[in-house]
Amino acid sequence: MMHTYPVLSHPGSITPFGLLWRIACGHGLNKWPFDGLIINKLKTVSVVATTLVLLNNAAIARCPKNLDFTKRFLASEQSVHLCQAYAGKVLLVVNTASYCGFTGQYRGLEALYQQYREAGLMVLGFPSNDFLQEPRSEDKVREFCSLTYNVKFPMFEKTRVAKRHADPFYQALANQSGDYPRWNFHKYLLDRQGNVVASYGSSVKPDDESLISTIESNL
């Protein structure tokens, strides 16, 4: 009697595995019919994996140039490609420091993040010692941000941001905005397409009406 079983790589179709088994035996391949089912399942997994890789490569190929960078998380060995992680989000990119008169802005930045994150806003913090106010190790910076301001938004490796020695990511932001950070807590706002739509100096607080209005208009 010939039995039929569904083929996983072709949902809804039926393959006569009894026939497959008899043909296999006739060629000296004494295999049980379920071997065919397993083979088809493995083929399906392979096709899915290949498709995911192709989609991922295509997404990177379409990545906005301002986000085409890989950055390491603060005090971590884990890195992330900014485009893969944050493409399609509105981004507020801020260079931070622990010993600055503007350090209290951490609290406002976290409030912004919590208020608008579900709508698509991401705040990205980049500690920098370019202005000699972040001498701490990355471990100490992370501890300070967590214990003092309960920072939950993503924080990244210590980064050069000033014009003369700026990190390539900050060079890209400055080239489009025409404005390099002159002090700690400079803010770049990027739209969902990865374009810099606004640049704010250190004195512009996270609860500034103009900043909030521009964020909301881009969400």
Predicted regions and their residues:
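Hydrophobic helical h-region of N-terminal Sec-dependent signal peptides
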Residues: 47-51
